[in-house]
Each structure stands twice: as structure tokens, then as C-alpha cells.
Amino acid sequence: MYKCALVLAAGQGKRIKSDLPKVLHKVCGKEMVNHVIDTIRKAGIQDANIIIGKGAELVKERTEEKNVTYSLQSEQLGTGHAVQCASEFLKGKKGTVAVFAGDTPLIKESTIKNLFNTHIENKNAATILTAIVDDPTGYGRIIRSGNEVLKIVEHKDCNEEELKVNEMNSAIYCFDIELLYESLSKLSNNNEQGEYYLTDVIEILKSEGHNIGAVITDFEETIGVNSRAQLAQAEEILKDRINLKHMENGVTLIDPKTTYIGIDVEIGKDTIIYPNNIFEGNTIIGERCTIYQNSRIKDSIIKNEVDIQSSVILDSSIGNNTTVGPFAYIRPESKIGEKARIGDFVEIKKSIIGDGTKVSHLTYIGDAEVGKECNFGCGTVVVNYDGKKKYKTIIGDHSFIGCNTNLVSPVQVGDNTYIAAGSTITSEVQEGDLAVARAKQRNIKGWVDKKGLKK
């Protein structure tokens, strides 16, 4: 059977008080609407249409890689009106369509599958995802007669008896596409808000004798984000889920409460994560690594048995058995080899560092290719920028760079070379050479007395 989805993402979200469309606020490093789309796809629904409105172009930009289509809701006149705006997407289709809110990032793949299966197996015209809550204030109520679903009443339109109902509408549904399409033209805005409610479709279908079903799920999954406080709540819930998944897969988190792992991050077994670490984007961390406190790693590949302490690694790769930090900064497009050492207060920018090379402290390497088994003394600087353009430096294998050396790019240093401490290198150093580029020391006798500086 054909399955598709509509994602309602047209609202600005006044309560969140932001210039950014509400659905583009991130939870665990990913936009809420993209959480919804990714979960839909995992549940086996490939055809999705996003209903956009406020900030439409920005929403399209942030979701363009998801292979979705779009419908425009120019005026926000309610959820029913939003689905009406997707009529062209629905027209002529047969099967089942699910409707999701773009601000519900906690919905699970298994719940979506269960909703579809229940809907199809029971041949329902509509199936509502619901939850039981102690305080349903603000939510639409599921009105039943026994176990039979009769209708959904929005909170502001509830009478005294309906307000006592604690089964709430999650705003996630499955519909028979043809029946939904026919019902959209029958919606009315005769209510307190003057809006077209998608929930009224339930009552329309029921009045026509169609079967309406409901699937009850955990309230946590249905939380819609309408404020910064709810955004933080969703972040905390999803963070706990992610951390639990990694611990179940063999990763040790010393303090899960202070460990922030993005939803797309992968971590190998027997890796140990200390407190106050942040892993973001498409980061992959291998097995048997130790990530000590206060590190941030984003969009990077960390191979096996790597030790990292109090460092920042962005869009780079670190080879097996390498150590990084403390207080190292690996900037984008850097590649660090195996068994290397990147020490304290070292900055690597857009450079390749060969296997076994040691850059132990207080060094800047930018736009460089460094061979294997090299050693950098303290205070080395690759001078790669002349104020207009950045230039490349190449350093061969087994080279020794003395302390306080400046390598003025573009420059090439051959294999097995030595550079004396304090040198400023401006031209090629050939293989096997020692380069000394510093002024000869000159001692001026009696200078302190002559200047009257003796104490």
C-alpha cells in the first residue's frame, strides 16, 4: 500500500520569540523538522511533503537534502487550512497519509510503524495518535463513547465535561488519502479561533459512518515545542535517549548528564567518555578511545585507541593511537596520522600531519603537509599568510624543527633535515641539511654599566 506523509511547518512560533522559524530550532544538533523527516524515512515512508509558510525559503534551504516536496501556506489559518494547501500533493493518490507537526522531534520510528499498521489492519478512515496525561491543559481532547472515538475538541472549545478528559490529541494522524481529500472541502472556521481545524475531519468522517481509531503512546513522544523551556525539555529527553543507546552499545559515559552527543554521532565500544564533552554533526569515534573532560568534536573521524583531552576538533580526522591535547585546536580539513602527538596549545589548520609526528606544544601549523616521524620544538610557527594570500609549506619525513622556528611559506623542507632553534626559514632546505637562519650572537662588554642600569 502507498504511504506518504505531510509535515506541518508553516508557523512562526510566537511563543518561542525568535526570528528563526520554530521548526528550524535544533534539538541535539538537528533541526526539529529534520528530526521528524528522518524518523518518517526510518519508518519506511519515502514520499513526504512539507507545508511551509513563515520563513519558507529558509525552511526549504535547511531541508533541501531530504528529497521532499513543498506546499505553501501563505496565511496561517489553522491546521486544516495547512493540509488544504497540500491538496495538489494529495490529489489522485490512493493509500494512507500520515500528518505530523514539524515541532515534534521526539516521535519514534516504532510508534509511526505501529500507527500505520493499526490504521491499515483495522481499515480505518482515520487513526489518531493519543496520550494519557495528568494535566492536558492546552491540548485537544479525545472524546469517546466507550472505546469508540467520536471526535476531537480543541481545548479552547471544550465544555466543562470535555475539559475533564485526560486523553489528549498528539496532532499526529493517519488518514485514508481519498477520504481526507474529500473532507477538506467540508471544513468550517466556525469556532472561537476562526481557524480551520484538521481535527474537525475526524467528526466529519465519523458522521459519514467511517471507522475512527486511536493508538495510545507515551506522552513524552508527543511533546510539541512551543517555547524555549519546551525546547530545553525536548533536548534533555533526546539527550538521555541518545546517551542510553551508546551505553547499551558498550560505551562508558562517566557522567551522562554532562555529556552531549548529537543524534548522528557514532561511537565504538570500549570507548570512555569523561564529563563535559560535546560531540556534534556526523562525528565517528572509534573503539577503545578515551575522551577526557572538556572537549568538542564536530564532523570528524576519530580512529581507534585515540586519547583526547580538553581540545577542539572540527571537520578533521585523527589516526589510530594518536594523542591530542590538552588545549589543542584542530581546525577544518586537517588530517592527523597514526601514533602522532598533538600537544598542549597546538593549532593545526588545513594540514596533513604524518604518522608518528610529534607537535608537542605551543605551535601553529597552517596549510602544510608534514611527513612521518617529524619532531616540532616548542614555539614553531608556519607563517602561511602574507596579508593577501595563504601559501603552502611541505616538510619531509624524519625532519627535526628546533624551538622558536618560523617557516615562511611557501617553503619546502626535505627529508631528514634539521632546523636550528630560533631560525626563520625563507628558502628550501634540502634533504640531509642543517639550516641555521639567525643572527650571530654578539656580546657588548660593560654595556650595563655604560647605560647606568646596574643594580
From Swiss-Prot:
> Which interval of the chain is the signal sequence?
none
- Chain spans, region Linker: 229-249
Keywords, in A-Z order: Acyltransferase, Cell shape, Cell wall biogenesis/degradation, Cytoplasm, Magnesium, Metal-binding, Multifunctional enzyme, Nucleotidyltransferase, Peptidoglycan synthesis, Repeat, Transferase
Which BP terms from GO are recorded?
A: cell morphogenesis; cell wall organization; lipid A biosynthetic process; peptidoglycan biosynthetic process; regulation of cell shape; UDP-N-acetylglucosamine biosynthetic process
Q: What is its EC number?
A: 2.7.7.23, 2.3.1.157
Chain residues that bind acetyl-CoA: 384-385, 421, 438
- Quote the subcellular location field of this record: Cytoplasm
Pathway(s) where this gene product acts: Nucleotide-sugar biosynthesis; UDP-N-acetyl-alpha-D-glucosamine biosynthesis; N-acetyl-alpha-D-glucosamine 1-phosphate from alpha-D-glucosamine 6-phosphate (route II): step 2/2; Nucleotide-sugar biosynthesis; UDP-N-acetyl-alpha-D-glucosamine biosynthesis; UDP-N-acetyl-alpha-D-glucosamine from N-acetyl-alpha-D-glucosamine 1-phosphate: step 1/1; Bacterial outer membrane biogenesis; LPS lipid A biosynthesis
- Name the segments for region: N-acetyltransferase: 250-455
Instruction: Using the UniProt annotation, give all residue ranges assigned to the region (Pyrophosphorylase).
Output: 1-228
Q: Does Cell cycle show up as a keyword for this record?
A: no
Describe cofactor binding as the record notes it: Binds 1 Mg(2+) ion per subunit.
Q: Name one GO cellular component term.
A: cytoplasm
Cofactor names: Mg(2+)
Q: Does the keyword Cytoplasm apply?
A: yes
EC class of the enzyme, as a word:
transferase
Cited CDD domains: GT2_GlmU_N_bac, LbH_GlmU_C
Q: Name one GO molecular function term.
A: UDP-N-acetylglucosamine diphosphorylase activity
- This protein's source sits in the domain of life called Bacteria
- Which chemical reaction does it catalyze? alpha-D-glucosamine 1-phosphate + acetyl-CoA = N-acetyl-alpha-D-glucosamine 1-phosphate + CoA + H(+); N-acetyl-alpha-D-glucosamine 1-phosphate + UTP + H(+) = UDP-N-acetyl-alpha-D-glucosamine + diphosphate
The record's listing under PANTHER family reads: BIFUNCTIONAL PROTEIN GLMU (PTHR43584:SF3), NUCLEOTIDYL TRANSFERASE (PTHR43584)
Q: What does this protein do?
A: Catalyzes the last two sequential reactions in the de novo biosynthetic pathway for UDP-N-acetylglucosamine (UDP-GlcNAc). The C-terminal domain catalyzes the transfer of acetyl group from acetyl coenzyme A to glucosamine-1-phosphate (GlcN-1-P) to produce N-acetylglucosamine-1-phosphate (GlcNAc-1-P), which is converted into UDP-GlcNAc by the transfer of uridine 5-monophosphate (from uridine 5-triphosphate), a reaction catalyzed by the N-terminal domain.
Do you know which NCBIfam families this protein is assigned to?
glmU (TIGR01173), PRK14354.1 (NF010934)
Q: What is this protein called?
A: Bifunctional protein GlmU
The scientific name of the source species is Clostridium botulinum (strain Alaska E43 / Type E3)
